[in-house]
Amino acid sequence: MSESEVGKDTTPEPSPANGTGPGPEWGLCPGPPTVGTDTSGASGLGTPRRRTQHNKHKTVAVASAQRSPRALFCLTLTNPIRRSCISIVEWKPFDILILLTIFANCVALGVYIPFPEDDSNTANHNLEQVEYVFLVIFTVETVLKIVAYGLVLHPSAYIRNGWNLLDFIIVVVGLFSVLLEQGPGRPGDAPHTGGKPGGFDVKALRAFRVLRPLRLVSGVPSLHIVVNSIMKALVPLLHIALLVLFVIIIYAIIGLELFLGRMHKTCYFLGSDMEAEEDPSPCASSGSGRSCTLNHTECRGRWPGPNGGITNFDNFFFAMLTVFQCITMEGWTDVLYWMQDAMGYELPWVYFVSLVIFGSFFVLNLVLGVLSGEFSKEREKAKARGDFQKLREKQQMEEDLRGYLDWITQAEELDLHDPSVDGNLASLAEEGRAGHRPQLSELTNRRRGRLRWFSHSTRSTHSTSSHASLPASDTGSMTDTPGDEDEEEGTMASCTRCLNKIMKTRICRHFRRANRGLRARCRRAVKSNACYWAVLLLVFLNTLTIASEHHGQPLWLTQTQEYANKVLLCLFTVEMLLKLYGLGPSVYVASFFNRFDCFVVCGGILETTLVEVGAMQPLGISVLRCVRLLRIFKVTRHWASLSNLVASLLNSMKSIASLLLLLFLFIIIFSLLGMQLFGGKFNFDQTHTKRSTFDTFPQALLTVFQILTGEDWNVVMYDGIMAYGGPFFPGMLVCVYFIILFICGNYILLNVFLAIAVDNLASGDAGTAKDKGREKSSEGNPPKENKVLVPGGENEDAKGARSEGAAPGMEEEEEEEEEEEEEEEEEEENGAGHVELLQEVVPKEKVVPIPEGSAFFCLSQTNPLRKACHTLIHHHIFTSLILVFIILSSVSLAAEDPIRAHSFRNHILGYFDYAFTSIFTVEILLKMTVFGAFLHRGSFCRSWFNLLDLLVVSVSLISFGIHSSAISVVKILRVLRVLRPLRAINRAKGLKHVVQCVFVAIRTIGNIMIVTTLLQFMFACIGVQLFKGKFYSCTDEAKHTLKESKGSFLIYPDGDVSRPLVRERLWVNSDFNFDNVLSAMMALFTVSTFEGWPALLYKAIDANAEDEGPIYNYHVEISVFFIVYIIIIAFFMMNIFVGFVIITFRAQGEQEYQNCELDKNQRQCVEYALKAQPLRRYIPKNPHQYRVWATVNSRAFEYLMFLLILLNTVALAMQHYEQTAPFNYAMDILNMVFTGLFTIEMVLKIIAFKPKHYFADAWNTFDALIVVGSVVDIAVTEVNNGGHLGESSEDTSRISITFFRLFRVMRLVKLLSKGEGIRTLLWTFIKSFQALPYVALLIAMIFFIYAVIGMQMFGLVALQDGTQINRNNNFQTFPQAVLLLFRCATGEAWQEIMLASLPGNRCDPESDFGPGEEFTCGSSFAIVYFISFFMLCAFLIINLFVAVIMDNFDYLTRDWSILGPHHLDEFKRIWSEYDPGAKGRIKHLDVVALLRRIQPPLGFGKLCPHRVACKRLVAMNVPLNSDGTVTFNATLFALVRTSLKIKTEGNLDQANQELRMVIKKIWKRIKQKLLDEVIPPPDEEEVTVGKFYATFLIQDYFRKFRRRKEKGLLGREAPTSTSSALQAGLRSLQDLGPEIRQALTYVTEEEEEEEEAVGQEAEEEEAENNPEPYKDSIDSQPQSRWNSRISVSLPVKEKLPDSLSTGPSDDDGLAPNSRQPSVIQAGSQPHRRSSGVFMFTIPEEGSIQLKGTQGQDNQNEEQELPDWTPDLDRAGRDSFEPSPFTTSLVQQHVNGHMSTPTFAAPHACRSEPSFTIQCLQRLGSCEDLPIPGTYHRGRTSGPSRAQGSWAAPPQKGRLLYAPLLLVEESTVGEGYLGKLGGPLRTFTCLQVPGAHPNPSHRKRGSADSLVEAVLISEGLGLFAQDPRFVALAKQEIADACHLTLDEMDSAASDLLAQRTISLYSDEESILSRFDEEDLGDEMACVHAL
């Protein structure tokens, strides 16, 4: 068979599905078939083509399996119509066609131009006709899909898919609208009006068409991640939306109460309805509001209100809209100022400022937190999916490759006898036989062996190192058409021979050598240091030439710039060509920077050519010219940290591309919808042309983009409302469009930008570190200059990256630089280390020693004066006093009057200033006396903070000295006094920490600043090219040039011809312009803050030419410049900036947690556990009081109150402006009713709880306050109205009632205490506030300093209405200045305030300016002042809020199965039910019930079977007190510790010791007592609840065994003899052995799944026996399962034996609150074994007895037993001994959450036990055998402890069993409670003696020996050593097997007599011989421990 035949057979006939041989997965040939058969080919996946076909078949098969068998009830899958529909719908071109149709439809919708009054034109009419075509196409698509997939019933039906449903609705609505249009037209209508055909407005239905672009989302996969993460985030966002809604509702109702009807008074001319002002604003006829100052004007009502009556608080809905507008921080100051005009300055600012802080800064930043959390989670998922996919593909390729090779070798083996086979193949087959599998690359190289040059070139591109790197498709092409290749090879070979001949000539050789030398020299030159700096210099010159352009520049400068540009272009071209030649094209192109360079140079050449030819508009040219500026980024190449940043920015760009696409779709949809709704409607105001309209598609896009950025979106909304008839019912609905657009666009999509930025930066940090390492390794290998070939793929990349680099010397320098940088970065990372050190140092300042060296050259170190000063300045009173004086001096600065410089107040403050300065001077002199001035280490001036102090004081002193001379100098010095508050930083540690944080942040943000500034500079240069000198205009819009704008002109305000005004024509420039680079950067900075950019945009659109006026909409396409700038700078770079700040703060915060071994979450949880106090729950004793208490605490009562609050809210929200008197009366009556009901609630609660307990709860105090306030409110209203209801009005009232009105609203806040989710949110809010005090202090300081500077610099500017410095907004008083700064911080038109503060403004008439200085107020300093303040606030300070919020609210998106501090409140609440008195202790019996009531991850959850809960408790190690109780903190701490795995590995004592150290290190002030309580010290032998619960397992197990046996679950044949019964019992004991060990070594999770399965069966079984299971222990919590698994180092048993199945036993019905006694006996001397196991022994002295109650087995009633705690007189020798307890009690102890302790072997110790617990004894046994247990205290630990599981007591040495017992030592490992390896079963041979050899033990029966032997065989030798434990186990076996003890003994004797016993295993039986000596050895071994 020839090679070509092999090739042909690669695609054999498809074999049947159940074909023989390996399937397509293997790609192997099935054995040696006969020659010529088809089977010799590869199977289904033999070739890639074949594989894709196979995959396609497979997916089709899967899809068809999912399809509904019938569509539309009649079409089956075999129906030809349906089959053809399916094939059409799944045909790829069909999808493409539909997408193209959607796109075309969008274009058609965009081209449509809406006209006013529903007018139309021919183009629109034609577009309407085209719409029918689209509708037909979409209808056909829908019908086809419905036929193919079915309509709705089947899961894969058409409508079940969300996108399809959307399509379906759009199509149905479209058809519906067409039907309506066919209705009878009205007579006289134009034939094609766009409006209301058929008498019905179809426009609303047409609006649905605009949703069609959404279908593009389903067609673009990269959009899915973004859309998915947004969808996923919607669930937590819903929580936040509810919270925002709640805030809005509360503020709206408060607004109704305070501001109802306030906006309707303004100034009118007396006797007419004409408004007195051009721009009217509210006024107050009385009180402290604005009064009408003009003559003949009065303040009266009936004014609609500002914004045409939209902005007001007249009813609930208007109030909500106004509040929402304020939360968005757009136009909120206008509303505030109107309210101040209407009411005065007292109340409104509190309302609005608090609204902005809560609503905007806090609640809305939560959106960001949630989105960024969800986004990073979604991206991780996508990444994981991608990685998995890659891995699968790689494995698939490798398998395919193996298949090919096997197939080739096997085919050749078959065909070796064929003479046509090439020698290559023969050798190949030999290699195949020899076991060497050739790689694919080798095969191809052999095939191409003759083509030397060809293989030569492939070597450089294909890596020969690994076959996996070659894609499978290559291999396919090589094996597909070998015949053709042979022909090609022939022709190629002849060409090669010719080429070789030519190359061997001498000339060619010389030429090649010269060429090689020249290239090497070029390469060295290009990489040299000199070249690098030369290029940088050229870049700098290039930048300088472009930046020097400005408006009105002289001619010579223009010419110089042109020449310079051409010269520089030539130089850059030369550089590019040199690199191309020296490095070779492939290497040159490999570097991104080189490609970029090439693009810039080619752009430059193109631009120059076009200019010379004159073929292009200058506009485009100037833009191209600016592309050169991108060269600036060349600087970044050798600046490692900067290039890393640029790389991560480019990465972010990739992920942002899909978001931009989504954003674009979103904008298009809303623009089209806006055109449908508002097209041609914004023409209601004839006098003023609106710019932000929806009249054309481009204009609509701009308007939507403007709303998206949030700038003046409210103004557009007002226009929209006015277009629909103003603030009345239908018109107000329009606001829904704008609100949805704003929320989805601004809050969700734009926050996703920030989320992506934060996410990329966070993940980028890790990436850059890796890159650094890689760069270093690649740069370590210098390139070999004489080789052109690059050996491997990776090196090629490295070389590409370095191809621009320097010579070797340069590389070394670079490495050094990088190392330095890394060190710097490490320092930065350890910044918090420095911070911590500083924090440590600050307290020590009190005792800083006097430094060596003399002060002032005369005072030595021992000088008494110096010592006295030292004592004085370190005295705490002195420090506090200085702090007080700093605060007082700051207050005096704020109190100065900036206008009247010589006022009495200023004189007084001047004297204070003298005093303060003197005090500070004395302080500095004292400090200098102590520390010396500056010459030696530790001297005063060596500290930065001290230098700051010195500066502040010396400035004050100098300003006193030069009163008279230069005024400006004094002013500057006076301004510098503001730095005084900064001295407080040195005194307050927390503040110092925050300040250092800010500095670290500023340092790390440096790089981002540089990149942003470079980009900003670039855009500014482009702006200068485009707009220089084009922003001039004449005040008369009719004139367009400077020459024309002379004289004056008339204007008619509001179009009123009767009132003409004369104005002068002026030629003015725009405030923000692009005349030079600095102005351009300033203008662009304001654009990037989103303030006032639409005005600038429309100026740019209208810009015509230099020195010419604007032309309306001249260049609409120019808007692209602004949009690109906003997206790159404002959306992207600013968000990266913010993200950087957030990440830096987060990193700073986490650095604290780096040095203490606990992460942040662990630390917070542990802190909570240590600081938490139990809640007091008062339960009254008095029966009547108890009834009231029960009522008040009932669910029904709670729901009733909830309903009342809601009804009250509705009643409050019903108020409105101009309500009728009866309505008023009804409202007052309702208010009284509600107040009465709430008063009754308060009285009832006070009766139930007594005042002391009632007021202990904060919510109750709040309630009481509200009730009292409401009562006062009613009383005051009555007094004011003289007893008449319904007549209250603020103006007539004698007492101000607005304050008391608030109490009505505050009832709403009570709702917050009701919802669980909201409660958690609130709790986290309060936590955030706790994290914020120092941040808030820093913000307050910045505000203070800026406010005082503002007062000094801009306080003299006159207040003029109509300007930005006016009565509401000025610097004349300190509070006003702070409010103005707060306004700037929210970004509300800050740039206009800046312009109003520049020089040339009118001065305040009261200030003392000289003649002619009237217009000299203001200062150029305003630019620096406002920009620095805005940057500090908007970027740093506000982001501190964001950082804190994102930190604290990460739980909203975190995995809920991870324990966090927000879970721990539940523990307190449920604990209080068990410990109502808040004593902090509960019985250990209640612990299991308690933990089963708490949901995971903290508790076990009610689904956790009781037995598993007990096992978990065994592992938790909760310390048990001597009275049988556990403490609150210890239990909570143990839960946290176990759940978060804090120090749970290794030796318990060692782990405890380490944890104690960690806790002491972090919480230095923790009380020793508390620490000992939660982590017992090693010298105390603590008994834990876990150890106490251990023996519960034995009793529970045997009882279950007996019950199953009775029910016949363990097999039908009953044992015939006592011997076999005994064997069964012993076997069961052996089965239990591993379980006891597991329980004690924390292997509680392994069997859970099996337990659950059997547990259900057991629970059903139990339900029959027990009518009321879990009566009280299950709370109505939502069901959840404990999901997190704990990895355990123990091997798992393959299958649990039947008898081991768990589940709650019969007696689980016991209520959890029942209290059982513990019996305690005091002994004398505590003792402890070095093995660390607790010893349980019984003292032989007589004991006092305590009787328990007796009852029946399986008893279900709750038994109340007396709580008792014996007095332990440790000094005396008294002791207690209980009588045996009842059987039922024992069972209750077992199932009612208590069990027996673990046991240890007796020890040769003379001491007596300290106290003993004797319990759990069975009733009805032959002898009273209590389970003994001794608790020991107070002995130090033994000398050495072995490592083991933390839950297990450590032990000394390893337990080595006797040889016969243990087959291999390694199989059991460390034995009792140690590390277990190997199988858990050990099959051993034992020989049991009749009596124990040790004479000290009592004589025991054969049964005892057998039980001991079984225990020992199971590794429980220490238990076997305790005769009492053996007796208990024997008793349990006897009971379970229905034997008496005598029968058991005799059966055991029979077994021993036979000298055989089978091993107690279910699977097999081994004969064992028992020997006395062997057992003696075993016991001796146990003793040796």
Swiss-Prot record:
Stretches with biased composition (Polar residues): 1675-1687, 1713-1724
Annotated TM spans: 93-111, 130-149, 162-180, 202-220, 240-259, 348-372, 530-549, 565-583, 592-610, 621-639, 659-679, 734-758, 877-895, 912-931, 944-962, 969-988, 1008-1027, 1118-1138, 1196-1214, 1230-1249, 1257-1278, 1296-1315, 1335-1354, 1422-1446
InterPro entries per record: CAC1F_C, GPHH_dom, Ion_trans_dom, VDCC_a1su_IQ, VDCC_alpha-1_subunit, VDCC_L_a1su, VDCCAlpha1, Volt_channel_dom_sf
Keywords for this protein: Calcium, Calcium channel, Calcium transport, Disulfide bond, Glycoprotein, Ion channel, Ion transport, Membrane, Metal-binding, Repeat, Sensory transduction, Transmembrane, Transmembrane helix, Transport, Vision, Voltage-gated channel
GO biological process: axonogenesis; dendrite morphogenesis; gene expression; intracellular calcium ion homeostasis; retina development in camera-type eye; visual perception
Basic and acidic residues bias locations: 1-11, 768-787, 1767-1776
Ranges of biased composition (kind: Low complexity): 455-469
Region Binding to the beta subunit, annotated ranges: 395-412
Residues bearing attached sugar chains per UniProt: 295
Disordered as annotated region, ranges: 1-56, 455-490, 766-834, 1643-1729, 1746-1778
Binding site for Ca(2+): 330, 711, 1091
Gene3D superfamilies assigned: 1.10.287.70, 6.10.250.2180, 6.10.250.2500, Voltage-gated potassium channels. Chain C
Quaternary structure (record): Voltage-dependent calcium channels are multisubunit complexes, consisting of alpha-1, alpha-2, beta and delta subunits in a 1:1:1:1 ratio. The channel activity is directed by the pore-forming and voltage-sensitive alpha-1 subunit. In many cases, this subunit is sufficient to generate voltage-sensitive calcium channel activity. The auxiliary subunits beta and alpha-2/delta linked by a disulfide bridge regulate the channel activity. Interacts (via IQ domain) with CABP4; in a calcium independent manner.
Alphabetical list of PANTHER family matching this protein: VOLTAGE-DEPENDENT CALCIUM CHANNEL TYPE A SUBUNIT ALPHA-1 (PTHR45628), VOLTAGE-DEPENDENT L-TYPE CALCIUM CHANNEL SUBUNIT ALPHA-1F (PTHR45628:SF2)
Record family assignment: Belongs to the calcium channel alpha-1 subunit (TC 1.A.1.11) family. CACNA1F subfamily.
Official protein name in the record: Voltage-dependent L-type calcium channel subunit alpha-1F
Gene: Cacna1f
